[in-house]
Amino acid sequence: MSESLSYCLDQIKESADSIATLYFKPPGIFQNALVHNSKTSYAEIITRLIRDADPVDEMSLYMTDKGGKLRRKDGKQGVYDHLTERAATLKRARLLGAPEETPIVHVPKEFYLKQHDIITKKKQRQNRDFLFDEFSKESGGMFEVLIKKFAGDQQVRNLLLALQNGSVITGEDASSRRKTMFVEDFSVELILRLLREIVTQWPLNEHRTKYEHLLQTYHDISDATNKLRAQIADQEHRLQSQDALSEEPDADDDDVAHPTSGVSYLIQQELDEIDALERELEQLRRDSRT
């Protein structure tokens, strides 16, 4: 009984020491899989696992130059090389007594140009619905064909550039400022004209069906809009006629016309109807944009 109690007390003391010193015994799977030699320290094993590289392969990638600095054998330089060179330059200038530069990291211009090209390519939109490929000599995409087709039509060319890049910068407007146009800024007629050329050059049934559906929808909305405009014009004409009939000159009020209550009611009714038609017209315009 006393031996078992002593054993339990020893285990408790060992656990307390482990918690106090933050030392925990590695699990058995780690011991069996990685520690093959009792003389090998855990620090070496963990360092090798974190680096995850073969020392022989590392040495084959780097070399030491005349100044004792590590360089890649393929000649490529990164941010570390640039910072190391800058630190050496600052140290040399400090020894010569030259004024120190401001603590700003000067990134080479080539790095910014490369990043700009990558970002520009990512921003290029590819409309796979109508098989728009990237503009390149190898692909021979539709953009190249369409731009050559509409070489003399600047509006269509601007629309193609907006489809490819998301937006296009046009010439100066009335305020002498350069104008940025997006795809939704172009007229519906111009977009349908471009789609008609696409389904003509590449006559696929799927694309033609979509184009005909869009064209029919546009005609329906256009007809409904024209009818509403005609109704609004008719209502305004009737309203003006009622205003002319309701004007009765009064000598006491310097010929100021005062419409009767019945005429005022009709006028208000016509105005309410015009407002309702204008709201319906605005709703049709929003539907056509979507």
From Swiss-Prot:
GO molecular function: microtubule plus-end binding
UniProt subunit comment: Component of the DASH complex consisting of ASK1, DAD1, DAD2, DAD3, DAD4, DAM1, DUO1, HSK3, SPC19 and SPC34, with a stoichiometry of one copy of each subunit per complex. Multiple DASH complexes oligomerize to form a ring that encircles spindle microtubules and organizes the rod-like NDC80 complexes of the outer kinetochore. DASH complex oligomerization strengthens microtubule attachments. On cytoplasmic microtubules, DASH complexes appear to form patches instead of rings.
Coiled-coil residue windows: 220-290
Protein purpose: Component of the DASH complex that connects microtubules with kinetochores and couples microtubule depolymerisation to chromosome movement; it is involved in retrieving kinetochores to the spindle poles before their re-orientation on the spindle in early mitosis and allows microtubule depolymerization to pull chromosomes apart and resist detachment during anaphase.
Stretches with biased composition (Acidic residues): 245-255
Gene Ontology biological process: attachment of spindle microtubules to kinetochore; cell division; mitotic sister chromatid biorientation; positive regulation of attachment of spindle microtubules to kinetochore; positive regulation of microtubule polymerization; protein transport along microtubule to mitotic spindle pole body
Gene: SPC34
UniProt keywords, alphabetically: Cell cycle, Cell division, Centromere, Chromosome, Chromosome partition, Coiled coil, Cytoplasm, Cytoskeleton, Kinetochore, Microtubule, Mitosis, Nucleus
Chain residue ranges for the region called Disordered: 238-262
CC annotations in GO: cytoplasm; DASH complex; spindle microtubule
Main location: nucleus
Compartment(s) of residence: Nucleus; Cytoplasm, Cytoskeleton, Spindle; Chromosome, Centromere, Kinetochore
Keyword Ribonucleoprotein: no
Listed Pfam families: DASH_Spc34 (PF08657)
Transmembrane annotation, as ranges: none
Native organism: Eremothecium gossypii (strain ATCC 10895 / CBS 109.51 / FGSC 9923 / NRRL Y-1056) (Yeast)
UniProt record similarity statement: Belongs to the DASH complex SPC34 family.
Name of this chain's protein: DASH complex subunit SPC34
InterPro entries, per the entry: Spc34 (IPR013966)
